[in-house]
């Protein structure tokens, strides 16, 4: 998901509602950000499972607050400067989805990045481990409708008589296939709420560990064996076009290593033996 212009404008306002510093001497203040790339304009972070991309409630502490503290501690911004502009993130991942979150240190960079996400001028790729065998890659289309009461979405192949149904497109390529699971590289073409999770579940291949859209019995088996409590879905790659909109970003690829538990489960399933270069690349080192 990307943020609207109204959201971007919010970060330039002076308000305690916008930024409340992370309280020092607490467990939360000990979080160390995993910085994938940064320069004077932008920063790309590898968000861990369990962390909010942005606040859901006023009392929450999200990646945005940790980002501000990081910039303050490293001397890249002052509290006086925060009175006129707040650096922020411009895309959002589900709380229990790990991976790349892009941030802007300047208003101009934040606006440009947000526009690139909105217009899909950059490519977003995910890794996920799904139930069942998928032998061939495919580009699938459908319509997604969100139930705000349950915070859950449903996907159908055909558009039904409702204005709320939004068109979605998801493209996937199998990187490794076993008897019971498939490691997929997913190109997120549109970027709707829970799109990858719901779309894959709709075609009979839910993501392992996804209790909202997945198979409860399978998830419980992985929980018992590995302690897995969240979906094995990771935003691992951003590919920028050859356009000089933001300095240093043309043709740049940002890659985020997968979490240790994700990596362990994949290795146990034989991904390493299969010689999956895409997974080795995303893992951060040769397995």
Q: In which residue ranges do the predicted regions lie?
A:
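RNA pseudouridine synthases
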Residues: 1-152, 161-169, 177, 258-268, ...
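Short, solvent-exposed loop/turn segments that connect beta-strands within catalytic domains
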Residues: 9, 244-250
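Pseudouridine synthase
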Residues: 60-67, 176-240, 262, 285
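Residues that recognize and position ribonucleotide moieties
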Residues: 91, 138, 142, 165, ...
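Acidic/polar residues at beta-strand termini and the immediately following turn/coil
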Residues: 147, 242-244
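Short, solvent-exposed loop/beta-turn-alpha elements that line the ligand-binding surface or hinge
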Residues: 155
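Long C-terminal interaction/binding lobes of large macromolecular proteins
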Residues: 172
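A glycine-biased structural micro-motif
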Residues: 249-252, 256, 268
């Amino acid at each position: 998901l990307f943020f609207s212009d109204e959201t971007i404008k919010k970060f330039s306002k002076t308000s305690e509602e916008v930024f409340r510093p992370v309280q020092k001497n607490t467990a939360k203040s000990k979080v160390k950000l995993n910085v994938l790339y940064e320069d004077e304009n932008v920063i790309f972070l590898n968000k861990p499972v369990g962390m909010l991309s942005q606040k859901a409630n006023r009392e929450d502490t999200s990646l945005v607050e940790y980002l501000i503290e990081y910039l303050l501690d490293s001397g890249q911004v002052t509290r006086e400067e925060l009175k006129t502009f707040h650096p922020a993130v411009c895309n959002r991942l589900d709380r229990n989805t790990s991976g790349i979150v892009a941030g802007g240190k300047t208003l101009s960079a934040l606006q440009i990045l947000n526009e690139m996400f909105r217009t899909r001028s950059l490519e977003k790729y995910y890794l996920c481990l799904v139930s069942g065998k998928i032998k061939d890659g495919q580009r699938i289309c459908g319509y997604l409708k969100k139930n705000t009461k349950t915070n859950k979405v449903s996907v159908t192949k055909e558009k039904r008589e409702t204005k709320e149904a939004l068109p979605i497109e998801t493209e996937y390529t199998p990187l490794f296939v076993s008897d019971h699971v498939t490691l997929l590289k997913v190109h997120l073409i549109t970027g709707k709420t829970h799109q990858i999770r719901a779309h894959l579940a709709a075609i009979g291949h839910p993501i392992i560990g996804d209790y909202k859209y997945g198979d409860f019995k399978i998830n419980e088996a992985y929980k018992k064996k590995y302690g897995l409590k969240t979906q094995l879905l990771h935003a691992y790659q951003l590919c920028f076009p050859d356009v000089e909109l933001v300095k240093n970003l043309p043709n740049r690829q940002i890659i985020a290593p997968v979490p240790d538990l994700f990596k362990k489960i994949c290795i146990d399933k034989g991904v390493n033996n299969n010689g999956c270069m895409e997974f080795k690349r995303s893992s951060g080192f040769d397995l």
